[in-house]
């Protein structure tokens, strides 16, 4: 798959199964994150790769968050199962670093670009994934359990694995509605 085909046809895959990327495939995914746009070479990101028992640990953190935040019984019951929807979840964190020329929003954007690069690298190697956020990405209890600082921000949970089925074709949105040209 060439790069342009990958970019024009990328789709999230919510149904994932084992195996997850391992060995060189995982190393390529990790290295792709390092090529994200990065003003002043701050590397304002950190990643936690959860697999096997790590998925259960992340699920326990979600469950505790649901309990502490007075979620419904159904949400509390569902919380520990969320990370088990894929054989691997990469927690992507924007790790803010004070810099006079690189504001917080730019560092969050950089970490977000790293997530996109990882998903594209996964797809290029025959895997796929879905970038999820939700309440747990913005929960102080989750941040504390992951030992993040108050300045850190979870930009998402990248679920990775082998596609459980082929995603049906869907036309891409028309780009014309989103671009204005000044000439």
What are these regions (language model features)?
Residues 3-12, 154-183:
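C-terminal helix-cap and adjacent tail motif
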Residues 87-89, 155:
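Structural motif
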Residues 52-57, 63-64, 96-98, 140, ...:
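Short, charged/polar surface micro-motifs in flexible loops or helix N-caps
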Residues 49-51, 91, 159:
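Short, well-ordered beta-strand micro-motif
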Residues 142-153:
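Short, electropositive alpha-helical surface patch
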């Amino acid at each position: 798959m060439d790069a342009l085909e990958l970019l024009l046809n990328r789709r999230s895959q919510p149904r994932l199964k084992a195996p997850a990327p391992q060995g060189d495939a995982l190393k390529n995914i990790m290295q792709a994150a390092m090529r994200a746009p990065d003003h002043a070479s701050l590397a304002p990101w950190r990643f936690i790769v959860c697999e096997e028992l790590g998925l259960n640990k992340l699920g326990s953190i979600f469950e505790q968050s649901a309990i502490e935040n007075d979620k419904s019984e159904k949400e509390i019951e569902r919380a520990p199962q969320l990370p088990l929807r894929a054989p691997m979840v990469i927690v992507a964190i924007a790790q803010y670093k004070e810099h006079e020329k690189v504001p917080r929003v730019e560092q969050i954007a950089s970490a977000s670009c790293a997530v996109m690069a990882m998903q594209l690298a996964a797809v290029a190697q025959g895997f796929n994934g879905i970038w999820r956020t939700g309440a747990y990405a913005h929960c102080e209890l989750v941040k504390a359990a992951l030992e993040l600082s108050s300045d850190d921000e979870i930009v998402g949970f990248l679920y990775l694995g082998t596609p459980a089925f082929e995603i049906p074709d869907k036309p891409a949105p028309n780009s014309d509605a989103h671009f204005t040209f000044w000439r």
